[in-house]
Amino acid sequence: MKKEEQNMTNYRYLYLVIFLFGILTYGLGLAQPAQAKQNQNIMSNSFNSQVVNKARYTLSDETNGRMFLSSEDDFTSALSEFDLQARMKSLEKVSKAEYLKFAGAAARNWTPDERQKMMKAASKLQAELDQFSISLPDEILIIKTSGAEEGNGAYTRRNAIILPEDYVKKTNDVQMEALLTHETWHVISRYNPELKLRMYAAMGFTPCSVQFPQALLPLKITNPDAISYSYCYQVTRQGKPVKVAPFQYATKPYDDGTKRKEFFQYITSVMNAVNRKHEAVMVPSLLEVGGANNILNVWDVEGFDVKTFGTGYLIHPEEITAEHFVKILKKDFTHPLTEKLAKELQTTKKS
């Protein structure tokens, strides 16, 4: 066969292969189930995603953020009368439906610069998280809000990290990475309950049966990152050991007619003293002169302080753990508790 004929034959074979490949891939595309195509569309619309241990950080747009924030979950079910009024800055009682609508309306879109900033932080965090065998949801949403729905604080719900726009604008790259790491721990904790309890136990916290004092129920302040206050820690009071469960409540009903105060300004962090059977004593002594000592302030006991835990964020073992999680990933082992928790986390390392 002549060289020219050989070349022509080769081209024909090449065209045939390309043609057959095109038909095959087109057929496979038609054979995709409707749900798979829908998922493909969702994936393509989820801009700036970063895979983390089988999970994907996704910046939620305003529409999806509104849908997420206006839906019910464990957090919204736990909200007290004060929670609802203070978040909406209302002197009148607020219904759950009113709050959900209000929360949804706080969702905002991301600017191009914000997207770049967030994904830079997520990329660094991925490299750190990849070493651990931890369960994560398929998708970790990052929702930007006006901040009005949660007193301009960063928080989590289910598989979402919610950040107020002021935080997003004002934090530098290092601060954003630390903030995203802290909030990511709450998602990890939620999806890894056994790991969470091991980390709590390493700090000295154990599950216990605690009933919130009845007189304070309407004033209870709910932390979306940790809605349960049923974790006890042994401290010393007047030379004697006593188990306490930290919790938060408002000093008084919401009464700000100017609508300038955030609910954080009403917070009192105290501890509920429990007996050996882990049953809560329900008389709030500090609110009733001469009452039994059942509600204690942090300064009323020894062993529940910054020196003990290496952080001033003492409102819940979940927040203490999140602070140390940031230090672990930064390899800052200045405080001995950080190293202790790091060793516990090592048990989840990939082999």
What are these regions (language model features)?
Residues E5-V17:
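Bacterial N-terminal signal peptides that target proteins for export
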Residues V17-G27:
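Bacterial N-terminal signal peptides
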Residues A31-A36:
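Boundary at the C-terminal end of the N-terminal hydrophobic targeting segment
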Residues K37-P112:
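N-terminal mature-domain "stem" immediately C-terminal to a signal peptide or N-terminal signal-anchor/transmembrane
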Residues L100-R157:
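Auxiliary, metal-adjacent structural segments of Zn-dependent hydrolase domains
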Residues A148-E177, T181:
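Active-site scaffold of zinc-dependent metalloenzymes
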Residues T184-Y200:
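Catalytic Zn2+-binding segment of zinc metalloproteases
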Residues A201-A342:
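Metalloprotease/metallohydrolase-associated module, dominated by Zn2+-dependent proteases
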